[in-house]
């Protein structure tokens, strides 16, 4: 594309977006929600919250397509063409509109009984330095995530090391289930495995609580029908939705 063509496209894109939104509003008035809803989020959110929402949306709005881009990297959702994003509140820009998607949750340390039988069970945070901790590489910076824990009622950041590095919390959970090492995961993801006894919760007094996941989107004069449909279904589907 020539430079002139790129300038022309940049100039008409807002108008085209307005036309698409007007068409979507017209069909919504007829009781149909259509179009493509693009959401950027973390893979962990898909497993924590989005699956039941998507299942309900498919039944209620069969002409609405939802594209989920699961990525560790925090992107500019407007520049990248997303309708909305889902992240921890602290990662969201202040000029965005936010709506709570999940309740608060704890980030916990888990390991399998096989691993603990072979390596022992840590009793203190300092003991983690002697264990195989499954690392998480952050997408945007490439840095290794430092575990956020509570030590004697004060927040601490712990650097860990181990034989495995992943780019996704679900991968860390899978490795913990396989007996590879200790993983730092959201408690809702591990709940079933804790109940079954496949995993054990380590150092429970050190678990950090996060404020939950929030849907966010740019401020507009009015909310697009497809995004409104998503929010309405989320409210009815998730018990923790506020």
Annotated model-derived regions:
Residues 79-81, 91-213, 240-242:
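C-terminal regulatory
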Residues 35-97:
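Central regulatory/effector-binding core of bacterial HTH transcription factors
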Residues 39, 199, 230:
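Residue-level signal for inorganic ion chemistry
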